[in-house]
C-alpha cells in the first residue's frame, strides 16, 4: 500500500463516519474543457473528487458504500487505450484503479448506466455533490427510475438524496 493511497483511504473513512446508515456516496470527476477545435485546456480534477480518491482522470465516477455488509470503494473510469494515451497521456484503466488508487472494484465508465442501479439498490441515502455542474443529477433520476421500475421484484428504492458538500467540509475539519 502506497503512502498516498493510505491518505486517501483515511479521508474516505473519515467521511464514512459522518454518513447516515445505509448510505452511498457518488462523486463524478470534472470534465475536460475544450480550448479550440484541436486542443483542450490543461485538465483540473474536481477538488472533492481528488480529495477522496487521488484519481486525476476525466470521465470517472467514484462510489463509496461504507455499510458494514457492503463496504466498497468503486471507481468507474476510462479503459486503457495505447493510441489515445499517446496523445492524451497515461490512463490508469480498471487495473490501475485497483492497484494504484485502492479501489475494491473498478469498471469501465461505459458500464456506469448499466451497473449503477445495482449499486444504489438497498441504500436508504444517496449523497452527491450538489455544487458540481457535471450532469450527475440527470443520471441519478434515470437510475432511480430504473430501480422504481423493478420495485415489484423486490428492489429497494433509496429514500433520500443528500448534499455531500457540507459533509466534506466537516470531514476536512476532522482530519
Model-derived features: positions:
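A composition/biophysics-driven feature that prefers long, compositionally simple stretches
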Residues: 1-173
Amino acid at each position: 500500500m502506497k503512502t498516498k493511497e493510505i491518505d486517501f483511504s483515511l479521508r474516505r473513512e473519515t467521511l464514512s463516519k459522518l454518513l447516515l446508515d445505509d448510505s452511498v456516496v457518488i462523486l463524478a470527476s470534472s470534465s475536460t474543457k475544450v480550448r479550440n477545435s484541436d486542443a483542450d485546456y490543461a485538465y483540473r480534477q474536481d477538488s472533492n473528487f481528488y480529495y477522496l480518491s487521488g484519481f486525476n482522470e476525466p470521465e470517472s465516477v467514484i462510489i463509496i458504500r461504507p455499510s458494514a455488509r457492503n463496504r466498497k470503494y468503486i471507481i468507474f473510469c476510462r479503459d486503457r487505450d495505447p493510441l489515445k494515451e499517446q496523445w492524451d497521456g497515461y490512463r490508469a484503466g480498471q487495473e490501475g484503479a485497483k492497484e494504484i488508487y485502492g479501489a475494491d472494484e473498478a469498471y469501465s465508465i461505459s458500464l456506469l448506466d448499466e451497473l449503477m442501479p445495482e449499486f444504489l439498490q438497498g441504500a436508504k441515502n444517496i449523497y452527491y455533490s450538489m455544487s458540481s455542474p457535471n450532469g450527475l443529477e440527470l443520471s441519478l433520476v434515470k437510475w432511480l427510475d430504473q430501480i422504481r421500475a423493478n420495485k415489484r421484484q423486490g428492489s429497494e428504492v433509496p429514500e433520500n438524496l443528500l448534499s455531500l458538500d457540507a459533509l466534506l467540509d466537516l470531514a476536512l475539519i476532522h482530519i
